Amino acid sequence: MRVYIAHNGCLEAEPIYGTICELVAQRKMSVITDPHARNNESARNTDSGVVSLNQAGRNKYLDQETTSRSINVPFCAGISIGGDGTFLRMARDLKNTGTPLFGVNMGRMGFLVDIEPEDIVNLVENIVKGEYTEEKRLPITASVQRGGKKIHDEWAVNEITIERKVEGKVVDIEVFVDGCRVMDISCNGIIIATATGSTAYSFSSGGPIVWPEMKVTLVVPVSPHELFAKPIVLPDNRSILLKVTSRDNKVVLCSDGQVRLCLQSGDEIACHVGKVPVVFGRVKKGCFAEHLVKKFNLQTA
């Protein structure tokens, strides 16, 4: 059995990282760490758990190329140590594998990660015994066409966005749904979000919160310069096409907050719901409404 561990590289996360590695090794499982953790020298050299794993030959620090090859071999679980950003990076590393993903919260909010550091022993036990539930979340994908040729494919858990590259500039975008133009706007950007991503960038830009099991896609303009450019909620089987009409090329394509590609005027971005779900592992019971109240510190009394 193999466990994939993603580490945010912060000093506060190192003891948790070492403890999880040691717990996993004690149960005769091997550990694969992401390149971000591999490049953290203090994480490699100061944690006794990590050193003993190296000596035992069960802990492998891999470069990106080796990591990609290792992903082809199944993992029993993926564990991130950090905030939502670390969890999303792990999800990208393990995309299309069906690996159950767990997150230990070392961030400020950690909406996607629900394991506290003091619960890591129970977490490893739950993984070993298979005592957890799985939530299957559909990702969003995008294909970029330039001059009639596909130049890039993208994938995200939360959202894919088109944004301005330079402050003070606006982005001109046409939005088509099933071939029908529904928006022609100037804005700071536009968000194509999943139900999972409805509590992230989409929410901060005025989009609605939707329950993660809902099969919908959100189209949310960011600071639009039109009076009636409002968020749209679509069934997840709709075809969404974005066309960049900005006269300059100060536009970028981002996925889950990371810049992936510089766009040009005339580029077309076709967005679809992914076919292979992202599997969220859950060891805690609770409903989504309770999670909202806790994470957003909502005043309910």
Swiss-Prot record:
Which Pfam family, just one, is annotated for this protein? NAD_kinase_C
Active site at which residues?
84
Compartment(s) where it occurs, according to its Swiss-Prot or TrEMBL record: Cytoplasm
The Swiss-Prot or TrEMBL record annotates one GO molecular function as: ATP binding
Cofactor(s), names only, from the UniProt record: a divalent metal cation
As recorded in UniProt, its EC number(s) are: 2.7.1.23
Q: Which residues form a coiled coil?
A: none
Q: Write down the InterPro entries for this protein, in alphabetical order.
A: ATP-NAD_kinase_N, ATP-NAD_kinase_PpnK-typ_C, NAD/diacylglycerol_kinase_sf, NADK
Task: List the GO cellular component terms.
Answer: cytoplasm
Q: Which reaction does this enzyme catalyse, per its entry?
A: NAD(+) + ATP = ADP + NADP(+) + H(+)
Q: Keyword annotations for this protein?
A: ATP-binding, Cytoplasm, Kinase, NAD, NADP, Nucleotide-binding, Transferase
Leading EC class: transferase
**Residues bound to NAD(+):** 84-85, 89, 158-159, 169, 188, 199-204, 258
UniProt GO BP: NAD metabolic process; NADP biosynthetic process
Similarity comment text for this entry: Belongs to the NAD kinase family.
Its annotated function is as follows: Involved in the regulation of the intracellular balance of NAD and NADP, and is a key enzyme in the biosynthesis of NADP. Catalyzes specifically the phosphorylation on 2'-hydroxyl of the adenosine moiety of NAD to yield NADP.
Name by which UniProt lists this protein: NAD kinase
The organism's taxonomic lineage, starting at the top: Bacteria, Bacillati, Actinomycetota, Actinomycetes, Micrococcales
